[in-house]
């Protein structure tokens, strides 16, 4: 770490849902510290946290309030939000205030001139992976249930394009409220068409309702799901309901960078958010080191200079970095098929 008396570089953390502990901040700080230990940062980095309750359970106003508070704290960059609905709100705020930010949502449309994106899943790229998995498993006819939200609708739009390209059939579709607690009626309408597979696409809260409804109906249909099933890391009590479902994750067993993180911070390496936080910390540290001017604009330019770092997310060989017109951090095979089995996430 830097030992000078210079003022610290202040980085804002914009949380858009209640945090359960300090895992994210600790993993992010570790990533920054790894860069600092190379001697390329001449001052400390201070994290300034703001909690908000964004969509879908909160409001746009909460996200805007937290952003305004961080702006007033004179941070030179922001990390967050984590949910696409809220990153879509934050991106124009970043552009207006000229504050670089790295969100860790799944939506490529959250990127902008000042908004960078570390992909914890992908609304646009997961559906082709799921459609290809259908072909691989010989499942040709899908019933699709998706969240009635920007996240769910974008997933459904991209799945429709992917299944059409591969000649797959959709037997029926149904939208579900993002915070729904009962999906029995919806599934009851989809079941008579006898699909080969149920495809769930959403933010994740409603996946619990779908799991409970499948059990109540005694419907043993194969299920493919998007990265919503990462909820299982935070909700161990939901894992049995996901048993046998295949889903998209961003952690892989063959990733050497993740294995190294596992040796140092097992809790962070144990799930996608910890790996993302560590990588975002490294990106920020490298961006600060590369900045020619310690201003918001200078940090944004520094981030665009970060290239070819090994990622802790994705399969081995996945890289992170940015560019002038490239604000997507992860490059390569960063989407990983996994399943919940005996209470554990297992790579397929």
Tell where the protein language model's regions lie, with residue ranges:
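Extracytosolic ligand-binding ectodomains
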Residues: 1-348
